[in-house]
Design a protein with these regions (language model features):
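Structural motif corresponding to the intra-repeat A-B loop/turn of tetratricopeptide repeats
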Residues: 12-13, 44, 80
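Alpha-helical junction/boundary sensor with strong preference for TPR arrays
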Residues: 26-27, 61, 80, 98
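Structural register within alpha-helical repeat arrays
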Residues: 2-5, 37, 57, 73, ...
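Alpha-helical adaptor scaffolds
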Residues: 1-35, 39
Length: 99
């Protein structure tokens, strides 16, 4: 968990939550905004929102953007206790979105 947490903190330390959230809402196809917003949702403790946001990106995006959303989601999964039921639901949803 240590490395994944450190990476998350580094990614979010200079983000302004209100600006990122507004950008993600106004530009749903902006993959960077969606990834940043998901990071902030994790930091604030809203795992469900972060997971759902990125799973929706995997469903909607194609190519490199889809891969970026999937990889980012998998990195966020590393922050969560494997026994957490939200993780199981998110993994199942991701599998469904991928296939």
């Amino acid at each position: 968990l240590g490395l994944a947490q450190t990476e998350l903190l580094i990614r979010t330390e200079k983000l302004e939550a209100k600006l990122v959230t507004a950008l993600a809402a106004s530009e749903p196809d902006n993959v960077k905004a969606q990834l940043d917003c998901a990071d902030l949702e994790v930091i604030s403790g809203d795992l469900d929102a972060a997971f759902n946001r990125l799973i929706e990106c995997v469903r909607r995006f194609a190519g490199a953007d889809r891969t970026a959303a999937k990889d980012h989601l998998l990195a966020l999964f590393q922050l969560v206790d494997p026994a957490d039921p939200r993780l199981k639901v998110a993994r199942t949803s991701l599998a469904s979105a991928l296939f």
